[in-house]
Amino acid sequence: MHIIENHNTRAGRVYCYAGECLWDKQLKKYVNPRVLVGHLEGEPPVFVPNKKFSLLLADTSQIETEEHDRKIIAVIKEKYGNSVRLGKPKPVRVQTHTAKAVFSGPSVVFGGITSRYRIDTILTKAFGEDDAKNILSLAWYLASEGDALINSDAWLSHFENPTGHQISSQDITRLLDRMGQDGILSFYKHWLKRFEKTGDKMLYDLTSISWHGHGIDMASWGHNRDNDDLPQVKYALLCTRSTAMPLFAWPLNGSVSDVRTLQDTLAFLDKLDYKPDCLMMDRGFASMENISFMLGRSYKFLQALRVNADWIRKIIDVGKQARLRPSSMIKAGERTYYASTARCQWVTLKKTSKKDTAPAQETLVYQCKDAKGEQYVAQVGEEVISQSPCMVHVLFCQDLVGSQWDKFMEKLNGEYQRLLANKHAEPTNELKKYFTVERKKWARKRNVDFNMERVTNHRDNYTGHICFITNDQTIAVAADALTEYSTRDYIEKDFDEMKNDLDMRRIRVHTDDRMKARLLIQFVAEIYLREIRVRLRDSDECRKMTRKQIASHIKGIYKIKFLGKYKDICPELSKSQRSILEALNIRDSR
């Protein structure tokens, strides 16, 4: 360990640092951490320690001083000897307080929501009373300010909160370490229990949280939704359709494809004794495996589909005449759709193609000829393992043709450039049918070209279509599927809120367990924001308020607390403050 003197030109002062050279096992290189210990003054220079080391140098016993600080003190004495000037303690000014202002707005609003959903009780069951108060206080801070937790001390010391005091960055780190996976999953189990029999449909989606640094094992390269050239962690979120109340959230490895995350999330929910009433998902989760998984375990769902699979194209082709009928027209907003619905059986069967070969398991989608949906009859060499009834809704919109075609051509062109750049690359399964890749005998390069017959067929028959598959009897017609699916923007708003208003665009911790704990605090903060947004949306007075305006009105609620026997005085609320409390159905509890 040694002293480093650095002249700061802007400050016009020489600052002193205690530096050392350490070997980092994880980075496999030497690092040079520095600690500021003071500065030099006068001529000849005299060392003036900062507040921390001034107190340590004044303490002659140093019984409670940490070993690392003792080494720094020894280096300071070795370097400067007697040329050390300790600061004089500032005189303590005694003040006699008659009254003080207590800003209780966040306590009134967030406390009311906490009581409504018993969030404090659930947190206490999962983490104990003290940690529950700390988690609530940090969640209130996030919901109010949306800044990094390390900056919470000023807010916690200014506003009423469950802890009653500020929480240092070291205490926040210890809290994240204590929370643990068992406590986090216990919280989700108790929270999900409140929404067991609501009969509401559930929205499920993923987002990306970028990360730069080391220590997060779950961070990997993958499709980044924010277009950041950084490793990422995927974040799965489940929320209710009617109010978008978040129910469950969990980080996943950043390299896992969207399709494969669904079964992992449902396995988590099954272990927590929760089964969604009806899952609503976008096309990113559509696959034969996922649909078979959900049907086999009796999950109800509404799944948007890509139109690139052969089985869905057959259904589109069969329903073409039905969609040409004027009676198939559906008006939704400014768009016009033409719809058809096919009753199907999702069939899993064993099929033997040759003698002395083991039967192969296959999945097929059988379009029922009967309106009631007859079952599939096994053919020669087939054995039906299971079959589940479902409905496929197909909608065609002329307004979507242009945008879908442009996206399709852009995707084809990107794949074409990739194949030209890498002579060993193969087309993806999704786009394989639209390319011809051949290498002629003795040729140096392979020939990559478009299969224009199939490209033209896609343009003429399949652009402008959106498709859904469901086994929920309450979504019996295509108009119902379109109406239900249009509410998916709720979950997109949740993600935008978490990233832009709750400091979730970057991971700011350095271990997987701390990340999961940090995301739980984020999840609790989102409960408050979602409750405020949904209830204020239905209020004529509050509907046009921005998030900053709402937070400003809430933080402006205060009371004057007198010392001694005098009662507190609660100043009159403004019209906006009264409107917010009325819309939230929260009484003024000052």
Regions found by a protein language model. Give the residues of each.
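Short helix/loop capping segments that flank catalytic or ligand/cofactor-binding pockets
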Residues: 26-27, 149-153, 163-164, 211-214, ...
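An anionic, glycine-rich sequence signature occurring as long contiguous blocks
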Residues: 231, 248-251, 298-484, 552-590
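Acidic, metal-coordinating catalytic cores used for nucleic-acid/nucleotide bond scission
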Residues: 280-289, 307-310, 513-515
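Basic, amphipathic alpha-helical segments enriched in Lys/Arg and hydrophobic/aromatic residues
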Residues: 511-532
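Secondary-structure transition/capping motifs at alpha-helix termini
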Residues: 25, 159-165, 182, 195-198, ...
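Short amphipathic alpha-helical "interface-anchor" segments enriched in bulky aromatics
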Residues: 481-508
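Dynamic "connector" segments at or just before major functional cores
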Residues: 1-215, 236-249, 253-255, 263, ...
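Short, basic/hydrophobic alpha-helical segments
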Residues: 190-191, 259-276
